Amino acid sequence: MKRINIALAGLAVVVMFTGCKSLYGKYERPDVNTQGLYRDPVSLTDTLAVSDTTSFGNMPWRSVFTDPQLQSLIQTALDNNVNMLNAALNVKMVEEALKVARLAFLPSVAFTPQGTIAKFDDNPVTKSYQLPLSASWNVDLFGNLLNAKRSAQMQLLATQDYQTVVKTNLISGVANLYYTLLMLDRQIEIVGEMEGLTKETWEKMQVMKDTRIGYRSTAVQSAEAAYYSVQAQRIDLQRQVREMENSLSLLLGQPAQTIQRGTFEGQSLPQDLATGVGIQLLNNRADVHAAELTLAQCFYDVNQARSRFYPQITITGTGAFTNQNGLVNPGKMLWSAVGSLVQPIFQHGQIVAGLKVAKMQYEQAYNTWQNTILQAGNEVSNALVQYNSAAEKAEFDAKRVEVLKKNVEDTRTMMSQSANTSYLEVITAQSNLLNAEISQVTDDFNKMQAVVNLYQALGGGAK
């Protein structure tokens, strides 16, 4: 034991002069530039200014999506979605791996009882037994176990963040599909109204053909075709509704079914869409945070790879109760203690290659982290421009709808009062009005979708 103590003391001195800082160092965030991380397009309202310090992404999801039916759907998805369930299992698996890394600091203990019965010729039967209890302790003088534990801790935190990523993606996915259904419902209503209007126009033209001399049958045919076109458009929208319901049911972890929902006009989303400063994405976005934790994990993997160049020190002790003849008196205790030191000299290049690979994996993790930050900024920029463009376009579409409604009314009146009005003017006016009203609903939906996408891009949904 005295020799072991001397060896340990000598190695401790060696550690002091061989850069133990590189073996025990803790991860520190590298420099990252978040200036101009996302664009600040000229917004239509002051609520879109990105200079605010409070981020829209910090709001709880129930405060953002206040529709009770949507809240119920989101909660169902969080409880039943397969990806959410698997993400939770991944966290539990990594937790078990961390427990193993922590227990590695403790001695390993083994109990290996043995018994022997022997008989030679006419000699009496001899019975012997041995009840050994052995313990082996790896002295973590060079940080191998410490860095393995820290790496496992980072892996656990990163896995928990990925679970949050799944949650935020699921919330935004359910919300977008829900609002898509509401948009389609409203468009079906508009098409239904236009269906009645085009049918009425067709019937009027039929009467005019029968009562006016020289009224062409082509006008009636065009009006009839316009009516059928609107009917076909309604069927197409109904198909899209069924597809959206099927997709939403899949996110809910349920068979395809009819989705209970509110109305498009009854939706209310927050108007304060402050994005906060770019550095907040490093804390709010779970995927950005997870990417940095993966970088930290690789940092500790590099430390662990360096520690393999140093000796491995193991202390082993054994105690046994035995009656083996020739060793000790029957029923006595046997004790032994051994200290061993293994210094790698030639490992076929495995240790050197392991360190090089660990360093390259660290560089890859750093690049991935940087790219994740850029991608987050890109998503924020896209959501902002989507909201602004939809809001700006909605103003023009609203004016267009107002003008076209009057145009339809005027052309219908003129058609019934004068033969100078072409049937094409009536049909064209109705078609233009339908397209404008559909576009107006799409604009409102795009604003809703932009709010959902911005909320997700800012890390919303974690709370």
Protein language model annotation of sequence segments:
Residues E195, K199, S229-Q257, K399-L458:
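Short segments within alpha-helical structural elements
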